[in-house]
Amino acid sequence: MANAERVITRVHSQRERLDATLVAQKNEVFALLSRVEAKGKGILQHHQIIAEFEAMPLETQKKLKGGAFFEFLRSAQEAIVLPPFVALAVRPRPGVWEYVRVNLHDLVVEELQASEYLQFKEELVDGIKNGNFTLELDFEPFNAAFPRPTLNKYIGDGVEFLNRHLSAKLFHDKESLHPLLKFLRLHSHEGKTLMLNNRIQNLNTLQHNLRKAEEYLMELKPETLYSEFEHKFQEIGLERGWGDTAERVLNMIRLLLDLLEAPDPCTLENFLGRIPMVFNVVILSPHGYFAQDNVLGYPDTGGQVVYILDQVRALETEMLQRIKQQGLNITPRILIITRLLPDAAGTTCGQRLEKVYGSQYCDILRVPFRTEKGIVRKWISRFEVWPYLETFTEDVAAEISKELQGKPDLIIGNYSDGNLVASLLAHKLGVTQCTIAHALEKTKYPDSDIYWKKLDEKYHFSCQFTADLIAMNHTDFIITSTFQEIAGSKDTVGQYESHRSFTLPGLYRVVHGIDVFDPKFNIVSPGADMSIYFAYTEEKRRLTAFHLEIEELLYSDVENEEHLCVLKDKKKPIIFTMARLDRVKNLSGLVEWYGKNTRLRELVNLVVVGGDRRKESQDNEEKAEMKKMYELIEEYKLNGQFRWISSQMNRVRNGELYRYICDTKGAFVQPALYEAFGLTVVEAMTCGLPTFATCNGGPAEIIVHGKSGFHIDPYHGDKAAESLADFFTKCKHDPSHWDQISLGGLERIQEKYTWQIYSQRLLTLTGVYGFWKHVSNLDRLESRRYLEMFYALKYRPLAQAVPLAHEE
């Protein structure tokens, strides 16, 4: 029998596949692309492209579904129409992009590079331009020699890939272990040596003395305190930091011996995660009203504040436990740096230092914005902070030095402004940097890059997108709450992924901004505060003292600045939502879906908590949404079935409010056009409230559709309303269905979304990235020089062009 020859199959490009399809299904493809072209000059998003397909005759749809073109179409994220051309950005899988352009006059297909596609896209705004030089940003050359995975399973698990690669590189022979020895010998805190002293000069001595220590420890009782053998260990070169008891020290020593003998990534991560490396943490969140009381619902003040306050308490608990278990007597410190607001609007935002409730060593440290004229007194929108941040960074550096009497071990940035300040500080101080986006505005506002000039006066996106690019490329590691935030899903583009290639016409063109396969990305999901948010079934913990206040909020016949409209039928289940009142949160969208759906209105009441009608808003977007809400109430005659409650700032009572909605057998709806994570989704599910949430962003990952909640498409509100009506109809006939979804949500939270899991992971990541930064070229010096130039030549002039706030 002849040996079968191995056949190598070449993967065809999108252009070749489209060429083949045009031969096989020429008429049908031409008909569809002609529909797209007929829309005229402009951009069609993925859902609009699919809508054009679904508007075709069923017979044509059927033919196309049977061929390769349909898969191509499903992968097309946008279409650029400049008749007779249609260009398509095709995404066969997360993080992988190809570009093609079709000439509909002669049905010629050409493949484009990212730069060519972006240049074509710019013609929508600037027309055809010849000879004009446009700055192109490309970070790819700096990463050419740096390893990165190609499999989707590694997206968001960068530390595992990094450990695999660098452990193989560093530990391939005994000589290559010297960087680890050097790291352990140099490791110290405030001048005090940790781990190893100068009695250990080489690897042979290290291994020999570790074995001696192992033999000695095996003779001791496991609970023997480190202090009882500290001097003996110092004589053989071992300092504090290995553990507080004989058992823990022995485990740590064995981990290192295993690494020296047969290194593997898992052992390496465990060892690095236990080295005492994090004692002082600085967290940056400049914008908004950052305080602990009476601020939620103020402009630019929402989930991020809650996230950080929960984060620092969990971090402190984990740091204290680790420091104790490492056998150290060091007091940790966590500083949340935000803006000091002299006009504090009845909050503590004018106070320099504020202790975080429920913590021992966490403080909010406020530093004012200032100009040459002095301190800026008033609140400033997050879209207008850019001209103040460089001076703010210098002032923050001085305040940190004063408070900590030294440098922090970790700097964490939050949102665009906090991440830029974190980048500047980390660069200045040489400290490990972590980035948390919370939300990247480019994703929230479709086409805000290509049409940035139209939006810049109001939003200053040119500054913000530039700051985002600088921060995400400067940072040591990025943590996200979900995979969606990084690389989206099969059908939706991730927040970070949308920064891979884009253009700001007339400013610069980003050919390669960020790669979702970069090992700096790690998914570390937060949770809800379990002392506030817990299941409605935990009767003994229920805060029934709030029930009279909650009933007043929901059912009072009084209409005032706190609650507008009344609920006539108090026995109906309640659809509940709570968020800031802005365009992207889409609360007015939910009200409109409800208003239009007669069946849903008969089944349930709607309660919306958002916006503050008790005072005049300073936020233009909130004003516009308020106006829309009033109009919807009148248009759909909602009074009697709808209640609009001003923002509620008491988190403890809000926790009981979720549980009270559970008692009505209601549901929580998160209708955002895009949501990076969805903390309110986690809060609602933690209380056992069945949840319907946007399919765009993090909630699509938090919720397992049909099991622990439901996904809804905010761009198809009619279908979302029908989905809600179907759920409540089913619950009416089978009450156990409500219980089933409620329990599914609770189980989902316990397995993945708790602050304890979060804090353990964050500290381990800090240790791992801090080590690799020390012993390898992970600090990416070349790209940081590139970023310095980009900051000075592009960001700074853009920031200086943003008008300063008018002070009366």
From Swiss-Prot:
Induction: By anaerobic stress. By hypoxia in the roots (at protein level). Up-regulated by NUC/IDD8. Gene3D superfamilies: 1.20.120.1230, 3.10.450.330, Glycogen Phosphorylase B. GO terms for molecular function: sucrose synthase activity. InterPro entries: Glyco_trans_1, Sucrose_synth_GT-B1, Sucrose_synthase_pln/cyn, SUS_EPBD, SUS_N. SUPFAM superfamilies: UDP-Glycosyltransferase/glycogen phosphorylase (SSF53756). One of its GO terms (biological process) is cellular response to hypoxia. Keywords: Glycosyltransferase, Stress response, Transferase. Its EC number is 2.4.1.13. Optimum pH is 6.0-7.0 for degradative reaction. Optimum pH is 7.0 for synthetic reaction. Optimum pH is 9.0-9.5 for synthetic reaction. Disruption phenotype: No visible phenotype. GO terms for cellular component: vacuole. Belongs to the glycosyltransferase 1 family. Plant sucrose synthase subfamily. This is Sucrose synthase 4.
